[in-house]
Every structure is written in structure tokens, then in C-alpha cells.
Amino acid sequence: MSSTVIILIVVLLVILVAFYAFAILMRKKTEDRILALEERKESLFDLPVQEEIDSVKKMHLVGQSQTIFREWNQKWLDLSSNSFADLEEHIFEAEQLNDSFHFFRARESVADSEAQIEMMEGDVEGIRQGVAQLVEQEKRNSNKIQESLDLYDNLRSDIADNADLYGTVITELEKHLANIETEFSQFVTLNSTGDPIEAAEVLETAEEHTIALRAITEQIPSFIKTIEKDVPKRLEELQEASDKFIAEDYILPENVNLKERMDDLQHHLEESSSLLEQFELDRVEAELDLIQERVEELYSIFEREYSARRNVEKRSSVLKEYIEHIRVNNKNLLLEIDHVTQAYILSGNEKGYVRGYQEHLESLDADVDEIIANIEAKAIPYSSLSRRVNSVVNSLEDIEKNQIKISETLSGLRDEERAAQEIAERFDSELRTIKRYVEKCNLPGLPKDYLDLFFMTGDRVQNLFKELGRVRINIDTINHLVDVSTEDMHVLKEATTNLTDHAVLAEQLIQYANRYKASNEQVAQGISRALQLFENSRDYDGSFDEISKTLEIVEPGAASRISGVYFKNKPTPDYL
């Protein structure tokens, strides 16, 4: 044979061996999965599901429990009779396919069987859990019934032993106890006839009702005590306080009808008792709170009247004296005004105000007479009288404050006049000092605007003297002239300082600039202009500015240096 044929034979043999090895491997894997399925099937089949179902059957369930059990039982019958046989058939088919080397079909069959058994395992687990819940519910009912009955028995015993604490509510409590007992009987019937689920619901309801009734019984004694003892006692005390209030000649405000309010309180007390018998505890509490609030409101009315009476008795006894005191003050104030007006002109209408106070006093006097008559008649609540008394007192206090204010104003007129006189004399002295100071400067003359300012200020001061010298002084006019004169003097002093400083500096700078006059034509011209402004125009500010600029041309900084030396050594003028 040729080498090519040999190679082909070898390759073919290798392929056959490889395929055989693959087939054996695939068959082995599928076989392992089939064996695992067999084991899972046997384990599932060996579970004691039937025994568990048979034990529940012996419980003879009825009602809702029986319906649930039938559903689980039917599901188990379907599994055991149909699903297991179908699973056996699928596993057998997979074995046949695997043995005949139909690997891919065998794998599909195994996969289907695995999915089927997984679903069956879930179903069996669900059946077992459902059956176990029925059994567990029965056990829970058996355990819980005793606890619930103990709660009920304890509650019934407590109510029976303390019946006197519950008053008329005892009848309603016994009705609720009877209803709970009926629920327990219903539970026993359901549980004994094999319906643990519905029985559990009834037991839960009975226990909830027992706990709720226990909570109610714990609150009732407190409400009973409040309704039957505390509130009646409080109302009795309120009635006694009311009788005492009336006996002591107190009058209630028109909007307070004591009998209606007492009847209303009694009605709310009866309503709270009725609501308690219906176990409307929240509404009972609301009614009792309302009673408490209205009782306190009545007491506050009584207290307000008591307090008002004390105030009326304390203040009304001195009202006449207070009015007379203010009236005397008013009379004296009018005399003082008449005396003051001989020397001063009053511009504040003080006399008109004081006469107005007199009229107001007459009105208040009439009010006081009426108040005293009402007090003696005992026909008006003291709270109303107290407000009127307070109003009169407040009015009298306001009048007295205004009287004092006017009196202080009148007393201060002499001081204001004296102060103005001193200021006028000081200004007159300062004007003379300014005049002498300027004259010492030996200036060729004074600018017109400065002279106008000086003479205007002098006229202001003379006007002030003139007003002060009148027979009757208008202090407002005086004060105005003082203010204006003060401002004028301030302006004049500043103008005097600027004028004299610039005049002296202009002379000093001109003398200093003369050293450059012969050698510098600009300086010569600047000196000429500065002298013209100084001697002819009497413009000392202009002369100072002109010579300062001229010096800056030939010797920068000279004007500033000379000015600095001047201000450093300059003595303070006498007028400052």
C-alpha cells in the first residue's frame, strides 16, 4: 500500500477512537444525571407526606380548615398518582436513549425530567407546609385558649370584686363580658368541630375585646370618682361662692347669667355620665375638661369683680381730693401765667391749655359724682366702675403732668433770659476784640464783604440787646436771635482769621520775593500785581495767592515753608 493510503487509514482509526471516547464520556455523564434523578425521585417518594395527611384527617376538620385541607390533599393525590408515573416514564425514556447512543435526545429528556422533579419537590414542600400549618394552628389554639381564658377570668373577677367602683356602668360592663363569653363559646365550638383557622380568628377577636375592656375598666373608676364626687363637690363649692358673691352685693356683668351657667354645668355633668355608660371615654374626658374650663371661667369672673371692688374702694375715696388738688394747681398756674406775662410774651398758648384743663376738671368732677352714686346704689358691676375710676385717675394724672410741664417752662424763662443776656454781652465783647485785632494789623483797608459781615453781625447782637431790653420779652424771638448770632459770630471769626493770616503772609512773601525782583522780570511783575491787590483792591486773599504762585516759579516750596513757620509761631487771637 502506498503511504497515502496508510495515512488515511491511520487518520480514520484516530477519528473512530476519538468518537468512541466521546460517546463513552457523553453516555457516562448522562447516566450520572439519570442516577441522580433516580435518587431524588426515591427521596421524594420516601417523604412521609401520606402519613402527615392521614394524621390531619383524624382531626376531622370542618369549615374553612377543611376546605384548605382538601386542596392540599387533592394536590398530593395528583402528584402521587400522576406526576410520579410521568416522571418514571421520562427517566426510563432517557435511559433508553442514552443506551442507544442518542446522546442529545437523552440530554434533553434528562433536562425535562430534572425540571419536572424540581417542580414536584416544590409542590411537595408546599403541601407539607400547608398541612403543618393546620396542625400548628390547632396547637396554637390549644395553647392560646388557656391564656385568653385566664385574661377573661381575671377581668371578670376584678369587675365582680370591685363592682362598687363602677357605679351605674357595671350593667354595661356585664353586657360586654357576656358578649366576650359568647365569643369564647363560639371558639370552643369551632375548634372542637375541626376548624382551627376560623376558630383562631374568633379567639383573636375575643382576646382583643378582653384587652380593650380591661383598658376601659382601668379608666372608669377615675371617671366615676370625677363625675360622682369631684365635679359635684366643685359645683357645690361654686354655688356657695356664688351665693356669697350675691350676698355681698356684687353685681355680675349683663352677659353673665349665673343660673343659666350653673344649669349648663349640671347638664354637661349628666352628659358625661351618660357617655361613660356608653364607654365613650374620649367624649367623657372632653365633657369633663369643658366643665373644668367653665368653672374656672366663673371663678375668674368672681375674682375680677373682687379685685375691681378693691380698686374702686381704694381710688374712689380720694378722687374728690385729687380733683381738688389738680384744681388748686390749675388756679396757681393761672396766677403764675398772669405774673409771667407781665415780663414775657408766651407763644405756646399755655393759658388756653390751663383753661381747658379747668373745663376738663369740671367734667371729671361730674363723672366722679356719678361714679360715687353708682357705688352707693350697688347697681353696676365693680368691673365697670373700676374701668371708669381708672379712666378718671388716668385723666387727672395726664392733666397734672401737663401742669408740671407748663410750670417748668415758665420757671425756665428767667434762666433762658439770663443765658441770652450773657451770650449777647460775650458777643459784644468779642466784636470789640475782633475790631482791635484787625486794627493792629495796620492794613490799608478792609474788603467790603468783610465789612458787611462785621456790621451785620454787630447789628444781630444789637438786635438781641434790643429784644432783651423790651418790657415784655418774647423768649422764642430771643432764642432765635441767639442761634442766628452764634452762627454769624462763628462765620465772622473764621473770616477774620483768614483775612489777617493772608494779609500778614502776603506781606512776608512780597518781602521775601524782592530778592528776585531785579534779576527776574516775572517775579517783578508778580510782586507788582500782588501789591496792587494788597494796597489798592484790599484783596488780601488774592494778593497771597498771586505772590505764592510767583515765588513758586523761582523757588518752589518757598511759600509753603514760610507759611508753615508763620502758623507754627502764630499766637492764638484773643477773640478765639
From Swiss-Prot:
One of its GO terms (cellular component) is plasma membrane. Keywords: Cell cycle, Cell division, Cell membrane, Coiled coil, Membrane, Septation, Transmembrane, Transmembrane helix. InterPro entries: EzrA. It is found in: Cell membrane. It is a single-pass membrane protein. Residues 105-134, 254-305 form a coiled coil. Residues 27-576 are cytoplasmic. Negative regulator of FtsZ ring formation; modulates the frequency and position of FtsZ ring formation. Inhibits FtsZ ring formation at polar sites. Interacts either with FtsZ or with one of its binding partners to promote depolymerization. Belongs to the EzrA family. This is Septation ring formation regulator EzrA. The lineage of its organism: Bacteria, Bacillati, Bacillota, Bacilli, Lactobacillales. The gene is ezrA.
